[in-house]
From Swiss-Prot:
Pfam families: HLH. This is Transcription factor bHLH138. The lineage of its organism: Eukaryota, Viridiplantae, Streptophyta, Embryophyta, Tracheophyta. The keyword Nucleus applies. Keywords: DNA-binding, Nucleus, Transcription, Transcription regulation. Residues 1-24 are annotated as: Disordered. GO terms for molecular function: DNA binding; DNA-binding transcription factor activity; protein dimerization activity. The gene is BHLH138.
Length: 129
């Protein structure tokens, strides 16, 4: 049962009239509910969130996105390195990036010109990100 107060009475009267103030209040309430839902969704996407506050959720999201970007650049580097090794060793690579053949491990700064050029291309590629 709702308690009677002047504030409730005033709100009900304004709500009945469809005044600008009541529409603004309802719009603001919907906006806050939408933000709360979005923060809840973001919090569920972040592994091991620290706290439940909005600021800490955003901060955790920033840290997590930066980690993911770093991981993506490392993986791109490894893929490029593997492709360079496959080209250098005349290994066949199909469209699904499956490598067939055997490879030999060389020192990255060997005197072989192809290995050095491939290393330079890879470093430029990683530096771009």
């Amino acid at each position: 049962m709702e308690r009677y107060t002047k504030k409730n009475e005033r709100f009900k009267a304004e709500e009945g009239k469809g005044s600008k103030k009541s529409r603004t209040f309802l719009t603001e309430r919907e906006r806050r509910a939408l933000f709360n839902d979005r923060f809840f969704d973001l919090k569920n996407l972040i592994p091991n969130p620290t706290k439940g506050g909005e600021a800490s959720i955003v901060q955790d999201g920033i840290v997590y996105i930066n980690e993911l970007q770093r991981l993506v650049s490392e993986l791109k580097y490894l893929v490029e390195k593997k492709k360079c090794g496959a080209r250098h060793n005349n290994i066949e690579v199909d469209n699904k990036n499956t490598i067939y053949g055997t490879s030999k491990i060389e020192h990255p700064f060997s005197k072989n010109k192809n290995t050095f050029n491939c290393l330079i291309r890879t470093l430029r590629f990683v530096h771009h990100f």
